């Protein structure tokens, strides 16, 4: 699973996701992509599950690019622990995803296989997504 090798701080504030994606909103590498339509936090496990669904359906043909990285630690207190006594320890890593962000890109497969594979990957994610393809120049 994906997580940073080293971070400046062990714990992070929750924060909010405002606005739409300005960077990473267009296809940069592949021919087809999966674009986020709503804001949310996507965990490293969800990204990995989507990647596995993609590669399995493509039968390891073509190439996959993951355009989001879980760089935000989410802390959690153990079960049945009273309030107070500090913030919990980091439990998982998430990526903040804004609407319009291209999350996955694929290339080297047909339109039909790409659409099916990205639809399977979208089922593993907690947000609404849209299939996008590069317009032929």
UniProtKB/Swiss-Prot annotation:
Q: Which domain of life is it from?
A: Bacteria
Q: Name one GO molecular function term.
A: structural constituent of ribosome
Q: Which UniProt keywords apply?
A: Ribonucleoprotein, Ribosomal protein, RNA-binding, rRNA-binding, tRNA-binding
Write out the GO biological process terms: translation
Any one cellular-component term (Gene Ontology): cytosolic large ribosomal subunit
The answer to whether the entry has keyword Amino-acid biosynthesis is no
**PROSITE patterns in the cross-refs:** RIBOSOMAL_L16_1 (PS00586), RIBOSOMAL_L16_2 (PS00701)
Q: Name one Pfam family in it.
A: Ribosomal_L16
Give the UniProt family note.
Answer: Belongs to the universal ribosomal protein uL16 family.
Q: What does this protein do?
A: Binds 23S rRNA and is also seen to make contacts with the A and possibly P site tRNAs.
Assembly mode: Part of the 50S ribosomal subunit.
Name assigned to this protein:
Large ribosomal subunit protein uL16
């Amino acid at each position: 699973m994906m997580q940073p090798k080293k971070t400046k701080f062990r714990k992070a504030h929750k924060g909010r996701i405002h606005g739409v994606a300005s960077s990473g909103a267009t296809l940069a590498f592949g021919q087809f992509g999966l674009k986020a339509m709503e804001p949310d936090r996507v965990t490293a496990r969800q990204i990995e599950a989507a990647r596995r669904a993609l590669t399995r359906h493509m039968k390891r043909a073509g190439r996959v690019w993951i355009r989001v990285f879980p760089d935000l630690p989410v802390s959690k207190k153990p079960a049945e622990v009273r309030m107070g006594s500090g913030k919990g320890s980091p439990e998982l890593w998430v990526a903040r995803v804004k609407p319009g962000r291209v999350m996955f890109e694929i290339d080297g497969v047909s339109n039909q296989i790409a659409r099916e594979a990205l639809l399977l990957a979208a089922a593993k994610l907690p947000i609404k997504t849209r299939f996008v393809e590069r317009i032929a120049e």
